[in-house]
UniProtKB/Swiss-Prot annotation:
Catalytically driven reaction(s): UDP-2-N,3-O-bis[(3R)-3-hydroxytetradecanoyl]-alpha-D-glucosamine + H2O = 2-N,3-O-bis[(3R)-3-hydroxytetradecanoyl]-alpha-D-glucosaminyl 1-phosphate + UMP + 2 H(+)
GO cellular component, one term: extrinsic component of plasma membrane
This protein's name: UDP-2,3-diacylglucosamine hydrolase
Needed cofactors: Mn(2+)
HAMAP family: LpxH (MF_00575)
Pathway participation: Glycolipid biosynthesis; lipid IV(A) biosynthesis; lipid IV(A) from (3R)-3-hydroxytetradecanoyl-[acyl-carrier-protein] and UDP-N-acetyl-alpha-D-glucosamine: step 4/6
Family: Belongs to the LpxH family.
NCBIfam families registered for this protein in UniProt: lipid_A_lpxH, PRK05340.1
Keyword Lipid biosynthesis: yes
Amino acid sequence: MKKTYFIADLHLSENRPHLTHLFCDFMQQLAPQAEALYILGDLFDFWIGDDEESALIHTVQQQIHALSAQGVKCYFQHGNRDFLIGKRFAAACGMTLLPTYQRIALYGESVLLCHGDTLCIDDVAYQQYRKKVHQKWRQWLFLHLPLKVRLKIAEKIRARSKADKKRKSEEIMDVNPDFVLQTFAQFGVKKIIHGHTHRQHIHHIPPHFTRIVLGDWGDTASILEVNEQQQVRFLTGKE
């Protein structure tokens, strides 16, 4: 039976090698069964440019390239941690970069994909930050800094993000329900799949909308499987 997989929020880093092992297991065992794999952002805990080299980056690149070579279409949508992943890395992986919002035909149904951070409009401070860091001139300047400088900046941003997260309420960091309804209408879809909030769940919204939230990866993987009969289930990679 034809199937498609969706993952997000792996936050891969050198400091958490078990996540890389989970990712490799998934890519080698489950992912080859799919027609397509959609990675909806925050594959990495941070990304400072396609020119960075590390054992982790090399491993991830190899895994995605190998899957793509088997005929599985691989797609990537930027997250709030790895929005600087560019064409160079994508090409090396054999994956296609997607815009902030991407509508796809999923076994006869029109579905909207996004990382999910743009739906959290109540977090005003983050939205202001996001607007700044997505300005092309700021990205150009950052990417032309020495790697060591970029790494220090990224570490400071991560530390600040963790501190901010502790201060903010759970409601502010979740999606805005009214904005979600506006997004359904704007893109003419009845189903949205996203990550970012780490709150794995399938929300059924009256009268006929569905919002599927991908989970983050921790002790186990979090994989959404959708098959050609429109059956939906979450997998942990240990099935």
